[in-house]
Structure formats: structure tokens, C-alpha cells
Amino acid sequence: RCEKEAVNSDCPVCSAEDADLSACKGTEQAMSLMAAAADDGTISGDVTWENQTITTPVRLTGDTTITLKGENTITISDTAEVSALEMDYRSLTIQGSGSLTVTVPNRKYGIADSAYSDTVGGKLTIKDGAKITTNGGQYGLSAKTIVIESGTLNLNSGYGIDTASLTMNGGTLYATGNYGAISNSYGKARNIDSNLTILYSESQNAKTDDMSVGTAADTTREGDVKTIYIAKMAPRASLIVGA
């Protein structure tokens, strides 16, 4: 922690000219704040976002874990970058008690490894109750491998998700899009916990009461199924598989 008589020259906050030392809360917070708003728009390693408002694309330069606190947003306009949060073949874990809302224009991606293929690509993991919302663009989430351990995901884009492999062990997923709920680029691997209920609809923005109970196979029906909802639910007599 920096004080008037002892300023850490390596502290990215307090070493600045005329810095407010009373705001110093230690190197850990200073480094997190620096990483959250890096001048070149890059992040790597362990990063904490707390009530961040980001308006330029962010790109990973190494495997990264983002811990969310409070309400965080990334909103980008039509830029040269493809994704609001670009994984660039890296692995990304998003965790924490906070939320992240990503809003992008047409043809752009939300949280994505935009150039993944059948041979290379990173893994996107959501856990610890993180709340993820995506709005607009081509894909909400796009990665070769997506793992949802827990959390609440509300994805509304051209496709809510684009992936070759989706694993879901807990949490709540609502994915919808005008093209489809889930796109199966380079594969249709699914591993969805048997304790979770899968609902589907051939309509975009469908309400759960209007959806039918399905199976993992329905999450691969790329062009037909426009909305997918997966969560732990109590059985309802009105829901019939394949109805």
C-alpha cells in the first residue's frame, strides 16, 4: 500500500504524477484496475472486473481468469475487431458473483475465440455463479469448447452459442437467436448433466411455458431450434418430450 512517504514506483496507480494516494488499496487492486482498462486493450492471467464500463474491444494475450464483481459491461460499436472479448485461441474462465453484459452490433461476436477451427481453439468456462448476458451480433458465445459449471447465461444474438463441444454441469442457460439457438461449427459434442432439464422451441425469444422438453440432440438442431433453455427444474405434467 502506497503512502506519501513511501510510494511504490512499480504501482501503476500511485506512481503517476499527482496521484491520489488516499485511494490506494494495494498493488493487487491497482494491477486489476490496470488490467481491466489496459491501454492496448489486452488482458492475461488473473483479472478482476468490478463495476467496469468498457467501450473498446478486449483481447486475451494468454490464458485468463476474469473474476466479476458488481455490474460490468462491454459495449462496442462497429470496429475492425471481430469480438468484444476475443480469446485468440486462449482459454478463458469467467467466475465470481458479479455480472457481465456484452452488447455488439451486427456481424460482430460477443465473447469469442473467433478463428477457432476443427484443430485449434481455446476453452471458455463459466462458473461460480457468474451472470453473463449477450445482446446482438452474430454469436453471443463462440469457442471450440464451452463448459458451464454454474452461473446464469442469457444469450440473444444471431446464434446464442457457436461451439463444437458444449458441456453443462449446472447453472441456467437461455440461448436464442434469429438464426438459431446453437450453431455447431466443427462438431456436435454434448455433455449435459442428466439432472438438468432441456427445453426447446422453434421460435425465437420463446417463453419456457411455451417450450417442449427435449434432449441433448435438440441442442444440435442448428437451423430449426431457435431457443434452448437448460436448468434444473421440477417435473411439470404439461411438458411432454417431443410435444
Residue ranges and their predicted role:
Residues V13, K25-A243:
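A composition-driven surface/loop motif
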Residues R1-M31:
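Thrombospondin type-1
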